[in-house]
């Protein structure tokens, strides 16, 4: 038999401890918690966007975000992984072109101070540098999930950030669900 090493064992935070910490937070944070709790019931949790101050530290394959924005598309394609590079070299499908038109239109409206939502079913669109800064609503089969695009998303697919399945948390089996409960009288 092996002996367990003696020493302090760090305790994992319990649900009660996290609830107490959440209760101690200011009221503004409580409103955010409420919306994320509602989102959790619907199967997704809103990601926290990365502040724009940290975007200056971003590099993609050695290029800064500003260099990526100025780069022509054919040079940017050479930086992508093989799967994404092959997809873009074949050309964009009509749904991809429509999405890019919507994005350009939304950026033009954002420059004027207005905002229009960009909704799409096109989950296989590769995130390009011109999409950065927008929140794109991606369809997951049930609802549209808001995906705030930051430089760290470049080169990934939109569908990676809008999960289509929920984690199933099974309850207890009901009456007659197992052989041991077949002969129990129903109330």
Curated annotation (Swiss-Prot):
Region span, Disordered: 1-45
Species per Swiss-Prot/TrEMBL record: Caldivirga maquilingensis (strain ATCC 700844 / DSM 13496 / JCM 10307 / IC-167)
InterPro entries: Ribosomal_uS19 (IPR002222), Ribosomal_uS19_CS (IPR020934), Ribosomal_uS19_euk/arc (IPR005713), Ribosomal_uS19_SF (IPR023575)
Top-rank lineage group of the source organism: Archaea
Pfam families assigned to the protein according to its UniProt record, in alphabetical order: Ribosomal_S19
Low complexity composition-biased segments: 14-30
Keywords linked to the UniProt accession: Ribonucleoprotein, Ribosomal protein, RNA-binding, rRNA-binding
Example GO BP: ribosomal small subunit assembly
Keyword Transferase: no
GO annotation, cellular component aspect: cytosolic small ribosomal subunit
Family that this chain belongs to: Belongs to the universal ribosomal protein uS19 family.
Basic and acidic residues bias (residue ranges): 1-13
PROSITE patterns: RIBOSOMAL_S19
HAMAP family: Ribosomal_uS19
Gene3D superfamilies: 30s Ribosomal Protein S19, Chain A (3.30.860.10)
Name of the protein in question: Small ribosomal subunit protein uS19
GO terms of molecular function: rRNA binding; structural constituent of ribosome
Keyword presence, Transport: no
């Amino acid at each position: 038999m092996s002996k367990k090493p003696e020493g302090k064992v760090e305790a994992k935070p319990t649900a009660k401890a996290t609830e107490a910490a959440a209760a101690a937070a200011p009221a503004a944070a409580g409103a955010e918690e409420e919306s994320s709790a509602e989102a959790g019931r619907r199967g997704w949790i809103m990601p926290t966007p990365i502040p724009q101050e940290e975007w200056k530290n971003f590099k993609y394959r050695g290029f800064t975000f500003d260099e990526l924005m100025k780069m022509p598309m054919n040079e940017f394609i050479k930086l992508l992984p093989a799967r994404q590079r092959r997809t873009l070299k074949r050309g964009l499908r009509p749904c991809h072109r429509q999405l890019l038109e919507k994005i350009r239109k939304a950026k033009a409206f954002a420059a004027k101070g207005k905002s229009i939502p960009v909704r799409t079913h096109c989950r296989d669109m590769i995130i390009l540098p011109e999409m950065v800064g927008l929140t794109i609503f991606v369809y997951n089969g049930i609802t549209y999930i808001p995906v705030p695009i930051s430089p760290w998303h470049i080169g990934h697919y939109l569908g990676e950030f809008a999960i289509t399945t929920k984690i199933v948390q099974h309850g207890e089996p009901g009456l007659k669900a197992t052989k041991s409960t077949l002969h129990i009288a129903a109330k």
